[in-house]
Amino acid sequence: MLPNAAGLLVAGVVSLSGVAAHGHVSKIFLDGQEYGGWIADVYPYMPEPPETIGWPTNVTDNGFVSPDRFSSPEIICHRGGVPSAISAPVSAGGTVELEWSTWPESHHGPVLNYLAKVDGDFSDIGPSTLQFFKFDETGLVSGSNPGYWGTDVMLANGRRYSMMIPSTIAPGKYVLRHELVALQNVGAAQLYPQCINIEVTSNTTGGDVNPGGTPATELYSPADPGFLFNIYEQYDSYPIPGQDVFRD
């Protein structure tokens, strides 16, 4: 149990964090097993925060990465993102479900998910060396002005977004990069990347594919149409940013 002083500190931080408009991944479910995420508006204030499979950050305001920071380390795993030393298993072809602490209904946009293979220990990762490939995305689902988006799917599912790990990738250590994009301010997209350490275990198919990838700092350009998109107009399609999705 926390000492009284530390408990009061955390209680105060939680109270203050309620005013923050955005969120973070607070719970992680790998093949149905629950793990805690990095509580970005609480753990940085604790002298000894718990270890999590979610990467620690200093995003105490639950804020975003703006397009002018696309080539900076902030876009990799958010501001102050550093590798966690621990991980958790999920099977190839298995399910990952990520729960957000909160998310504004007005913040419509796509959800993008990437993986990067890790050689060596997680704690020794150089974030800029990670090569990400996209394996899941949900952009515009239906409608327009503003339409129904990947973020709306997440909200409708109790702030949870589900994805499937490709069944053919090689087993081993990976960083999962999960990202929400908010388009409510036209021409000023907001990105919310979150990183999680997973260890993919082999399944009966015995997959051994290594898709390669791209550094996160090279995934996007501020001029990409998907970041300049006006969600308050009539439209019937949306150009999702980033790579094509890797398919089994």
From Swiss-Prot:
Its cofactor is Cu(2+). Binds 1 copper ion per subunit. Lignocellulose is the most abundant polymeric composite on Earth and is a recalcitrant but promising renewable substrate for industrial biotechnology applications. Together with cellobiose dehydrogenases (CDHs) an enzymatic system capable of oxidative cellulose cleavage is formed, which increases the efficiency of cellulases and put LPMOs at focus of biofuel research. It catalyses: [(1->4)-beta-D-glucosyl]n+m + reduced acceptor + O2 = 4-dehydro-beta-D-glucosyl-[(1->4)-beta-D-glucosyl]n-1 + [(1->4)-beta-D-glucosyl]m + acceptor + H2O. Keywords: Carbohydrate metabolism, Cellulose degradation, Copper, Disulfide bond, Glycoprotein, Metal-binding, Monooxygenase, Oxidoreductase, Polysaccharide degradation, Secreted, Signal. Pfam families: AA9 (PF03443). CDD domains: LPMO_AA9 (cd21175). Its EC number is 1.14.99.56. Cu(2+) binds at residues 22, 107, 192. The keyword Secreted applies. GO terms for cellular component: extracellular region. The keyword Cell inner membrane does not apply. Belongs to the polysaccharide monooxygenase AA9 family. Lytic polysaccharide monooxygenase (LPMO) that depolymerizes crystalline and amorphous polysaccharides via the oxidation of scissile alpha- or beta-(1-4)-glycosidic bonds, yielding C1 or C4 oxidation products. Catalysis by LPMOs requires the reduction of the active-site copper from Cu(II) to Cu(I) by a reducing agent and H(2)O(2) or O(2) as a cosubstrate. This is AA9 family lytic polysaccharide monooxygenase G. It comes from Malbranchea cinnamomea. The gene is LPMO9G.
